Structures are given as structure tokens and as C-alpha cells.
Amino acid sequence: MFYPDPFDVIVIGGGHAGTEAAMASARMGQQTLLLTHNIDTLGQMSCNPAIGGIGKGHLVKEIDAMGGLMARAVDQAGIQFRILNSSKGPAVRATRAQADRVLYRQAIRTALENQPNLTIFQQAVDDLIVENDRVVGAVTQMGLKFRAKAVVLTVGTFLDGKIHIGLDNYSGGRAGDPPSIPLARRLRELPLRVNRLKTGTPPRIDARTIDFSVLPQQHGDNPMPVFSFLGNAGQHPAQMPCYITHTNEKTHEVIRNNLDRSPMYAGIIEGIGPRYCPSIEDKVMRFADRNTHQIFLEPEGLTSNEIYPNGISTSLPFDVQWQIVRSMAGMENARIVRPGYAIEYDFFDPRDLKPTLENKFVHGLFFAGQINGTTGYEEAAAQGMLAGLNAARLSADKEGWSPRRDQAYLGVLVDDLCTLGTKEPYRMFTSRAEYRLMLREDNADLRLTEMGRELGMVDDHRWARFNEKLENIEKERQRLRDIHVHPQSELLDQVNSLLKTPLSREANGEELLRRPEVDYAQLTALPLFAPGLTDEQAAEQVEIQVKYEGYIARQQDEIEKQLRNENALLPADLDYKQVNGLSNEVIAKLNDHKPSSIGQASRISGITPAAISILLIWLKKQGLLRRSA
């Protein structure tokens, strides 16, 4: 039977991508249905109990800047907050939080259940309804049919998922959950490129069996950072330390002696695992010259006895896992409460997607998260938000939107996936972005909140706070520019106390702040420049904008040059065999990738500047060169 009410958008899957997709669509006013196999696991952290990190924290801030959920949830659930790279420049500083799994899941579910325009329904999805290359609905396990104008697939590791522990394996979406086999088979019938990837998770340890007294502690920062631009440290629950132990030669010997029982080394696992989160057996073999690896013992929550040993992801048999755990300091009597495992699953080539994350071959079908070959909660959530907002726009007959590489890490992520594809689980790093100085955590709202408002994602409260911050920044910069000090000033000694070289000419507040030895707090502590801003976010922006003004201006010039290519659009149905002068290799790559713009084409491996010039000349001659607004 058909469900009585039609929907604008259906989201399939309730993980990090699915929850952001559903929230985005509903916030934009579209009637949205979230289908999940289990309402109790909405927003579940399937692997590590943490949000953020290098590159990843930037994505969380961008999600928040556009009205998304992840940052607000972790502010309510985070049990340890730290700024990574705090001694480095603002471009690579990143926020990371350990999270209480239960509190995080509760925060996500509460937000979903109180979101207008959003319906949640518990049923696994077995099929899609596709008519004339257009998706028009979904069919659940019990045969119930739902109609919609757009469907977002956020199915994580569930598509034909297979769990491996040693040489044994069984079907599963993750530990304790069934796989999605009928839906995987249905998707393989569509004209899409599919492959397999692998990821893994470590065994969980009973904290009561660990001797923490012999292990160094790692505490969070004080004062505590916050993730959301609307958040404050008062929202954080009680804070907890992490602990550090290390593998040793005994650990490595256990691993080397049992490699024949590893499904990866025995050739049973075919999927490629994440390069930057390797299993402990992979680390021991790939870095054979190292006799120790650092392991972080991370608490899973305030009311849980489980410890997540970050750094020993493994698919070795349980008896070997037991030996590995007990070989490390403080863990001699440790007990495992959940075994580690690897999981293989289907993913679909993201080069078959438009930058909006809509599929090129099935109209109205959007993919987000691990189905696109990414790894990580943050990467999934960012894609989910983008897919959800574009599904909502499509259902309202509006054009899609996607950020450029110079606008957001989300733009880098999507462009990398859609242009280059991936053969291994893709994770975000700051090093993937050309314009890191422009794409900082601290200015995510300045980059994206206005666009979020235009798209209908940003509510009145966030918009008012954003405009207040903008006003504070501009007023303070003008105030500093208006205050001058000269070498004959009575206050010269106070100013010189901050400077490495005494002031020899008249200078205003901004010129003094531009000096590397002067920071905003020191400057505004002087009577002449007091009082400083009480809005810490605005004060940080004033300092960064002033100190990095020259560098930012140079990077903006580079961006404007690149935009000329980004805005030169390529016809979606162009057969590059028609373009005289291109090599067979270039023709094959362009026809395979089907880039949407000259800029995207230029980033495909093997596409030379000469080939781009030939293509531009041909497009002009044919009258096909169009530029986006």
C-alpha cells in the first residue's frame, strides 16, 4: 500500500548524513520523511566517540554556520574539548571534542523530534520507485510505499555490509545491526559504478579493569572551547580526561605471529581501508621500523564503563585482540566488552554525481556520506546537509547550490569527490584546500551564514546574532583606526612597552595590532585603546583580519583569477571526441568524468593547460561557452 501522505523529500538512513539531510530539508519548509531501521540509533556514533579534528572541525563549523545540527549537539554532549594546533596560525587550528555517546544521540533525536515539517518512520528500505529515470519514492521492508519528489540515500556501511573478525565473517550493517541487502541489489541494477570499501573499529575495554594510575592523563583546554557559533561553555556536561598508553615490541610480536589469521592479509577482505586510520596490524607492517605506537584511551561517556582505545582498530581474531590489549601498560588485566572488527560495504563512484550530490543518471536521487566513498562523521554530516538542502530545492523546482573550493571545505570535499572520485575512504585535511587562509574555523559564519539565510536554512535567532557580530567587528576596526598615537604622546611609554622597536612615527590602533608582537588583548588593555570587545568571537576576528590582511588580499586575487575558469560551464552532454586537437587520453578522461566547468576539468589528473586552452577555443567557436552568474 501507499502511505496516505506524499512527501517532498525522503531521507533514507538516520546516521550523521541522514540526520543533517532531514533537518536541512525540513528547515527549508519542505515536507520531509526520515526513514530509519531503528529510531533508537538516530545519530549514533558507530566508531570513535569524538567530533572534529584537523579539517573535520572546519566542516563542523561550516555545518553550524548554515544552521546545521552537529556542532550544537556536541556542545551538549562533549566531555572534553581541545583546540588542536593552537600554537600555529588560525588557518590550521581545529576544535575537537570527546563526546558522551548517549548524550550526543539524545541531542540529535530531541532536535529531530522537535523540527517542524519532519516525520520520522521506523522501517528498513528495500527498494526505490524509479519511473523514466526519475526516483519518485521508496518501498520499505514490509512493502509500504512512500512517494516523494526527491530521495536522499545516506546508508553508511549498510549496503551489503559484511563484518570480519579473524577468518570468520557474517552479514551486518555494523555490530548489532542487520545489513541492507535488498537495497544494495536494487542499486546495482541502476547504471551506476559500484565498488567495495572497508573500515574498522577497535575492541572496547571495561574501564574498571584498566590501571589508570600508571598512565599519563590528557585533559581538555581551559577555558573550554565551544563548537557552535551560538554555543557557550555552560552547555557542556562534566568533563573527563583521556589517558595514553603505547604498544610495544610484545604487542607487535603478537600481531606479526598472527597475520595469517587476519582477513585483510589472508586476502578475504577485498575492500580498501582508510589510509589515515589504518588498523594496528597495518601500522605494525607498514611502519616496521617503529617499535611503539601511541594509543589514546578515550571514555565513551559519563555513565559508561566502556573505553575506546583509539589506535588499535583491528580485524584480528578475538583471542589475538585479547593478547594485544593485555600487552600494553595499564592494560595487563583489561577485559574486552566488545570485539573489534572490520566491515566491507558497497560505495558508488562519486564522479556519477553533480556538485549538488544529485545522481547524474537518476533524477531526484541524492547520495551523501559513506556511500560516496568518504569516511568520518563530519564528512558525512556535511554531505548530508548539502544533499538535503538540494533535494529540498529540487522538490520546490529551484536550482541547486554547491559551495566553491574557495568558499568552504565542503566545497573542497564535494569537488574532490565529483571531479577525481576516490579509490579509498576519503577524509578531510586542511592540506586538501588551496585557500586555507580564507577557509578558517573562526570565519565559517562570515563565509556561509548569509548564503544559509538566502537558502532558508538560517533562523531569525542565528541571523540576528550573526549581524550583531558583523557590526561589532566593523565598529571595532573603525574605532582602532580612529585612535592615533605619535612619538610625542604622553602615553608613548605604555605603547612602547608592547613593541620590540620603539614607535618612531604616528600610528593608529590597527597599525599597532598588525605588529607580530602585539595582540588584541594587550592593545586594548592600554587606557588609550580600552575597552576591548566583550564579544570574544568578534574580538578574534578583528585580530585575525588586521594581522593577516595582506595575505588574505593576495589569496583573494588568486581566487578571482581561478573563478574565471570555475564560471566557464561545460555542456553536460558534450562528447569530447568532437573537440579537434585533444589527445585520446584527454578525450577519454573528460568523457569519463563529465566535468561541469573548465575549473573542474583542469583539476582532473592528466588534463594539461594546453588541453584546457584547446577546449576553451573550441567552445568559443561553437558558441557553447557559457558563464555562470
Curated annotation (Swiss-Prot):
UniProt superkingdom: Bacteria
Subcellular location: Cytoplasm
Cofactor: FAD
SUPFAM superfamilies: FAD/NAD(P)-binding domain
Chief location bin: cytoplasm
Keyword annotations: Cytoplasm, FAD, Flavoprotein, NAD, tRNA processing
Protein role: NAD-binding protein involved in the addition of a carboxymethylaminomethyl (cmnm) group at the wobble position (U34) of certain tRNAs, forming tRNA-cmnm(5)s(2)U34.
The name this protein goes by in its record: tRNA uridine 5-carboxymethylaminomethyl modification enzyme MnmG
Species the sequence originates in: Pectobacterium atrosepticum (strain SCRI 1043 / ATCC BAA-672)
Gene: mnmG
